[in-house]
Design a protein with these regions (language model features):
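N-terminal secretory targeting modules
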Residues: 1-19, 67
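Secreted/periplasmic serine-hydrolase-like ester/acetyl group-modifying domain
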Residues: 89-188
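Membrane-embedded segments
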Residues: 19-114
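Short, flexible loop segments at the rims of nucleotide/cofactor-binding pockets, characterized by
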Residues: 2-4, 48-51, 185-186
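Non-catalytic accessory regions outside enzyme or core folds
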Residues: 6-9, 36-38, 154
Length: 188
């Protein structure tokens, strides 16, 4: 996932295979909900499994009937209620795309470029502890837990290095009327 964003397909595949009793479904905003927060041992966080509200129904319909949850926590983002945002949804956004293997050459090029930019150290990555898998987890301590929840790793410890440090990116998106901050007259 580090060099392509196939989170939606991954979350669908894991949710289908696990058939958890408690399922969290939403955008990345829901990824911080962890299994330890719930009384059930049968939990999966499918945060990132949807970007538009219409995708939630498709996600659930694409689960085998015996894998569907007993309890669903559907996390709704504020922009789901903005008619301007929902009007730009691609017509095929709800279509389920299969999980595909990454293009190794593309991933290698991106990894090399990130290494040359100093985004990670080979010694640090190669010296990671057992149970840490992937470049993002090794380099930044960020990634998915087994229950589907997510940790932002060093981004939490050093928010000043974030793309959105001091809400700079958020304020730019609001000013530009774009990327989930489209202006709207009335809630949808």
């Amino acid at each position: 996932l580090a060099y392509r964003d196939d989170t939606r397909a991954l979350k669908q595949a894991v949710a289908n295979a696990r058939g958890a009793d408690v399922l969290v479904l939403g955008t990345s905003r829901s990824m911080q909900l962890r299994g330890a927060f719930f009384a059930s041992d049968s939990f999966y966080n499918a945060g990132g499994g949807i970007a538009y509200i219409s995708q939630a129904q498709v996600f659930l319909e694409n689960m085998p009937p015996d894998a569907r949850p007993k309890h669903l926590l559907l996390v709704l983002d504020q922009y789901f209620y903005n008619e301007t945002w929902t009007s730009i949804e691609p017509e095929d956004s709800a279509a389920l795309r299969p999980y595909t293997q990454p293009d190794a050459f593309y991933a290698l090029r991106r990894a090399l470029a990130d290494y040359l930019d100093g985004k990670y150290s080979l010694l640090h990555v190669l010296g990671t502890q057992d149970g840490v898998y992937g470049m993002s987890a090794a380099g930044r301590g960020a990634g998915f837990y087994a229950d589907g929840s997510y940790t932002y790793g060093t981004a939490v410890l050093h928010p000043e290095k974030s793309v959105d440090a001091e809400f700079k990116d958020t304020f730019q998106r609001i000013a530009k009327n774009t990327n989930r901050f489209e202006y709207g007259e009335t809630p949808d």
